Design a protein with these regions (language model features):
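Short amphipathic alpha-helices within nucleic acid-binding modules
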Residues: 203-206
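Extreme N-terminal basic, low-complexity initiation segments
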Residues: 2-4
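Short, Lys/Arg-enriched N-terminal segments with co-localized hydrophobic residues
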Residues: 6-18
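Nucleotide and nucleotide-moiety/phosphate-recognizing core
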Residues: 17-150, 157-159, 164-170, 180-194, ...
Length: 207
């Protein structure tokens, strides 16, 4: 696997050892037209899920990839030789309920209160500098002057907390991050790093 490099400050070493990463790769990609997780952008060394996993591996002791039924087999094969990567899919009774389904499935690996660094495959250009900034703060999410980015976040949560939120019938990840996790915004300048691959136009602009 191609690796990316980053210098991790000494004062982050404890967080690196105690934090789990979650890569959200289970979206249906309806607007995009094909599975965003497996798309490889021109000039990038890996596909989008590979980029996300590699970045989180630099900051987390274990990375959990939340897949869907369609890409589960391919992603499992992609990370078959990665000892610190686990691929999971939605669990009953919360299948196909958006990002929170993926977060619920991922928290099954460590159900107790745990630090998680979240990154969706929608953000292939996000930098490790941005992620490192989030790691230095607890319960936070990235925001820019024009948009909030709840799937680029660092939260402390448990499977019980995710379950309780889902049982309320509220599937908005924004409410989960801000209300259940009491996440606060960390503001970054607008930049290409926050390009969200929601459609083919975004893919063209990211090239």
């Amino acid at each position: 696997m191609v690796t990316l490099s980053i210098l991790v400050p000494r004062n982050l070493e404890k967080e690196v050892l105690n934090m789990l990463g979650i890569v959200l790769a289970g979206g249906q990609s309806k607007r995009f037209g094909r599975d965003k997780a497996q798309v490889q952008l021109p000039g990038q060394p890996l596909n989008n899920v590979g980029l996300a996993v590699t970045k989180l591996q630099l900051l987390c002791e274990q990375v959990i990839v939340s897949a869907n039924q369609q890409n589960m087999a391919n992603l499992t094969e992609q990370f078959r030789t990665s000892s610190n990567v686990i691929v999971v899919t939605d669990q009953v009774p919360f299948e196909r309920q958006g990002p929170l389904s993926g977060i619920f499935a991922a928290t099954n690996y460590s159900p107790e209160l745990t630090d998680y660094l979240l990154l969706a495959v929608d953000y292939p250009l996000i930098t490790t500098t941005i992620l490192t900034t989030l790691v230095t703060q607890t319960d936070c999410y990235a925001t820019t002057p024009t948009q909030d980015h709840y799937l680029v976040s660092h939260v402390r949560t448990s499977q019980a907390m995710v379950r309780a939120h889902l049982l309320l019938g509220d599937l908005r990840v924004s409410h989960f991050i801000k209300t259940t996790c009491q996440g606060l915004p960390v503001t970054f300048p607008d930049s290409q790093a926050f390009t969200n691959l929601n459609n083919m136009e975004a893919l063209t602009n990211a090239k």
